């Protein structure tokens, strides 16, 4: 029986390259597609798109598979970057990688691939897909340190039915060894850690190109004036670096952390010590909910959740709220739950879905 045609989203990195190699070895008619989703005329010196494209093309040449490319820069700007900027303008901390997966990799790319006559797409994500009781399930990758299901919670039944994750059963060291043994030209390339498709940049400088900074007061929770901040959009809860207030007189020597924001007053709150009570919350609300199965579990529902990537699963209970919101009550206090970030729900290894944090019961959140 002939296997279906699959196109691999090639980034130029090791993971997607090994994904293509494994599919070819498994007998899939495989091709590669390189997506260009960002155009930055003001910063060509830092742009690595040309090198990434060259690496992706070199891999397809070595494997003997066809190479395609597509420019989705307009879709990325309209569906991802505009939202990214708006969230920062409102003082929240968005996660563009999640939106990028939903709107670009598993929507625009998927539609493009199907239009080219392919049946499946594949990526280098560390996650797994299976079928149980007539539906597709999104599962954590075997490599718990690299598991990327947190970034994929917006996928639904259609996307999962057309997607393969060839690295889902592997650990990162195995992937690197496979790349070396196959003599892939990019086998020693380091993993990217920047914003999805934008890359690694000096974030503060980058953001200031698109949003005017609004400096304001920096105070302690006791209202003591500490100094000025450069703009609330540059800071996130729990942040330690880049505050510019180290070595203050009359301080106890402990490092300073961002513990709160008052958006109406444009005030940034800072305090010494990581465990300040303003950073702790037991209850949060979330909206923009998505369920992988297409519907929520029966509420109230006990499960686990992550409020940030690579966090240990936290036990919680989900309860219903009207108008598309959900309340999450944790068994233990959470550190720096941040509006704008994703909360993702799990039952053992299965990713159930998630949403966007809107508010918490932490004292430092004032919007």
Curated annotation (Swiss-Prot):
A GO term for molecular function: tRNA-uridine 2-sulfurtransferase activity
Spell out the disulfide connections. 100-196
* Catalysis performed (reactions): S-sulfanyl-L-cysteinyl-[protein] + uridine(34) in tRNA + AH2 + ATP = 2-thiouridine(34) in tRNA + L-cysteinyl-[protein] + A + AMP + diphosphate + H(+)
For this entry, list what GO says about its biological process: tRNA wobble position uridine thiolation
Q: Which residues bind ATP?
A: 9-16, 35, 124
One term under GO cellular component: cytoplasm
Identify the InterPro entries for this entry.
MnmA-like, MnmA-like_C, MnmA-like_central, MnmA-like_central_sf, Rossmann-like_a/b/a_fold
**Where in or outside the cell is it found?**
Cytoplasm
Q: For this UniProt record, give its keywords in alphabetical order, as a comma-separated list.
A: ATP-binding, Cytoplasm, Disulfide bond, Nucleotide-binding, RNA-binding, Transferase, tRNA processing, tRNA-binding
- The organism's superkingdom is given as Bacteria
| Active-site residues (renumbered) | 100, 196
Main role?
Answer: Catalyzes the 2-thiolation of uridine at the wobble position (U34) of tRNA, leading to the formation of s(2)U34.
**Protein name, as recorded:** tRNA-specific 2-thiouridylase MnmA
**What is the scientific name of the source organism?**
Nitrosococcus oceani (strain ATCC 19707 / BCRC 17464 / JCM 30415 / NCIMB 11848 / C-107)
